[in-house]
Amino acid sequence: MPPYAAAAGRPAWSALPAALRGAVAERLGGPVVAVRPAAGGFTRGFAGLLHTADGSASFVKAAAAAEHPHLVEWYAREAAILDRLPVGLPVPRRRFTLHASGWYALGVDAIAGRPPASRDELTAVAH
């Protein structure tokens, strides 16, 4: 299995359709001024931390429906699961979902953290 941090071949934010980028910025409440792409993962969809002019941030995933219908399904399912988690759990909350220019996007709260990396960490989060 390839290393998690080097596995994803993701499109850049600037490569996404302008209408999609505009719709995401509208949902975020202002223009996106900085992007920190997610280097890890195993999908071909966009994923990154977007910072807006007002200083807020959101983690956004996006996929082209025609090219990656399975990712659209996965992201929509993730949004549905996030909506059903009990209040008070230390998890990011869904901020928005949208369809624009043949793409589906999911935005969630930006949280500090990283994926568990060692066997001990994986065991701890599994229990």
Feature locations, PLM:
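ATP-binding glycine-rich phosphate-binding loop
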Residues: R27-A53
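Conserved hydrophobic "DFG−1" position in protein kinase catalytic cores
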Residues: L49-T52, A62, F96, A110
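A conserved alpha-helical element in kinase catalytic cores
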Residues: A57-S101, A117-A126
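Conserved short submotifs of the Hanks-type protein kinase catalytic core
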Residues: S101-R114
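Conserved hydrophobic/aromatic beta-strand scaffold that supports enzyme active sites
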Residues: A47-L49, F59, A105-G107
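Juxta-kinase regulatory segment immediately upstream of eukaryotic protein kinase catalytic domains
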Residues: M1-R36
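N-terminal/domain-start segments enriched in small and hydrophobic, helix-friendly residues
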Residues: S14-L16, L49, E73
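Short acidic/glycine-enriched loop/turn segments that link adjacent beta-strands
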Residues: G41-R44, A100-Y104
